[in-house]
Amino acid sequence: MPRADCGPGSLPERGLQGDVSAEDRNSGRSRLGYRCNMSKVGNLRGSGGGIVSATFEHCSYTGSLFPGNNVVRQPGVQVIDASNPARPRVVGSLADTAMRGGTWETLKVNKKRKLLAATSVPLLWGGGFFAVYDISDCEHPRLLNRGPGIATPLPFTSHEGGFSPDGRTYWASGIWPGHLSAIDISNPAVPRVIWQGLHGFLGHGFGMTPDGNRMFISNGLGINILDT
């Protein structure tokens, strides 16, 4: 891959792009940060956030962290309107049992079906609670499942998660052991676990091919390839 051409106002790495050298750390240069062809447009000081956030259209959804996000004025996942990027603003919060439990690396969007989903991960590992939202109106997400996953737990564990490309399945992956669950959301009002398995000693990080037929999931020492 060729080196990026960084224009005026940029602060790129002086050596290998993407690498913070020992020289930069020792000299204090790394404290200034790095940027290439990026400039700040606006900012918002909210209630803090969790590990992973998600975006759809002009909206951003800030992941929650348990228990801290439960003691702020608007608990749960913050909904941010960034239609005016110079002045983004909080327009609501998602405060169901899953979103308040800490979303860790599970808060994801499927653009094809206009869905937002997450599981409850209080600290590194969790499970049971799962929420699916319709984000057709991105500023006003609408909770679709009020029974399984919200009022009653589902039988899965999770640390991270994500949609299949078609948006009809949500995959929940527990960090240890390598526990993987497929949650059918073809009818998002009634999510149900349709498959579970152990793929390795642990799991952290997965991706899928665009056709949804293959999953690549880490196992701590390498990658497992699953036919999905």
Language model: regions and residue ranges:
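Feature marking well-ordered beta-strand scaffolds used for ligand recognition
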Residues: 1-228
